[in-house]
Amino acid sequence: MADDAGAAGGPGGPGGPGLGGRGGFRGGFGSGLRGRGRGRGRGRGRGRGARGGKAEDKEWIPVTKLGRLVKDMKIKSLEEIYLFSLPIKESEIIDFFLGASLKDEVLKIMPVQKQTRAGQRTRFKAFVAIGDYNGHVGLGVKCSKEVATAIRGAIILAKLSIVPVRRGYWGNKIGKPHTVPCKVTGRCGSVLVRLIPAPRGTGIVSAPVPKKLLMMAGIDDCYTSARGCTATLGNFAKATFDAISKTYSYLTPDLWKETVFTKSPYQEFTDHLVKTHTRVSVQRTQAPAVATT
């Protein structure tokens, strides 16, 4: 399989250094001479309002205990879910809390092929980043026969993978947090991405792919360092997302104080879950008996 990223990232191609440094992908973002979002990614990434459909009009019927607690307003925020490390299995939970502020953007759509006896089977792989630009970011990857189906699936997976982003200060703690709290490193394949705190006003000094993820995470100032085969956009984005998700994986002196945990929502609202539980009956059809002579 020949990846189209190599063709787009050459010195003379649309992703070359002479055309704004698009980072080797055709349908994403950047400030090249050919405009914004040429190729397969054209017209996408404008937020939830640009991709309306019948799915949003349907009433959400939760199928998990967490979904029932969220819909019944027993859980007030996403942070309560993250505090107890409860797995989120329904994308509607994210829409319930962050729906109005969520923005998504297609990073890349690439064809992948599988050799079969009938020939080559081509499918499309979509990379989608999603975030609210205020401390929550997610990354989804989906492969499907059709581009639209791959994008929809990647958006759902990105919502399910949303993580909280911890932000901090470079020097004096004045104003709102604006950068990563300390140096963090993420890895995927051969790609290693390091995020380094930066002074206020520096901006995000990075390639286009990490820059988009950091912006969606709500980080305003950050230095980055990357090594490995960063032309592989999927690994580059996953390594950046891994680094961002590690901002809450270590303790700092302000977190040394003993934390008094309350009961898990499943324990606290056990009676409510029992009352609202509806048993789903599955009708099993028995195959007709075959008469033998």
From Swiss-Prot:
Annotated crosslink Glycyl lysine isopeptide (Lys-Gly) (interchain with G-Cter in SUMO2) location: 275
Sequence ranges assigned to domain S5 DRBM in this UniProt record: 102-165
Region feature 3 X 3 AA tandem repeats of G-G-P, mapped onto this chain: 9-17
Biological processes per GO annotation: cellular response to interleukin-4; formation of translation preinitiation complex; response to ethanol; ribosomal small subunit assembly; translation
Residues bearing PTM Phosphoserine: 264, 281
Keywords: Acetylation, Citrullination, Cytoplasm, Isopeptide bond, Nucleus, Phosphoprotein, Repeat, Ribonucleoprotein, Ribosomal protein, Ubl conjugation
Superkingdom of origin: Eukaryota
Region Disordered: start-end pairs: 1-55
Ranges of biased composition (kind: Gly residues): 7-34
Biased composition (Basic residues): 35-51
One Gene Ontology MF term: fibroblast growth factor binding
GO cellular component, one term: ribonucleoprotein complex
Glycyl lysine isopeptide (Lys-Gly) (interchain with G-Cter in ubiquitin) crosslink site(s): 54, 58, 275
Modified residues (N6-acetyllysine): 263, 275
Coiled coil: none
InterPro entries: Ribosomal_Su5_D2-typ_SF (IPR020568), Ribosomal_uS5 (IPR000851), Ribosomal_uS5_C (IPR005324), Ribosomal_uS5_euk/arc (IPR005711), Ribosomal_uS5_N (IPR013810), Ribosomal_uS5_N_CS (IPR018192), Ribsml_uS5_D2-typ_fold_subgr (IPR014721)
Segments of this protein annotated with the region 2 X 4 AA tandem repeats of R-G-G-F: 22-29
Residue(s) carrying Phosphothreonine: 252, 270
Function in brief: Component of the ribosome, a large ribonucleoprotein complex responsible for the synthesis of proteins in the cell. The small ribosomal subunit (SSU) binds messenger RNAs (mRNAs) and translates the encoded message by selecting cognate aminoacyl-transfer RNA (tRNA) molecules. The large subunit (LSU) contains the ribosomal catalytic site termed the peptidyl transferase center (PTC), which catalyzes the formation of peptide bonds, thereby polymerizing the amino acids delivered by tRNAs into a polypeptide chain.
Protein name: Small ribosomal subunit protein uS5
Organism for this UniProt entry: Rattus norvegicus (Rat)
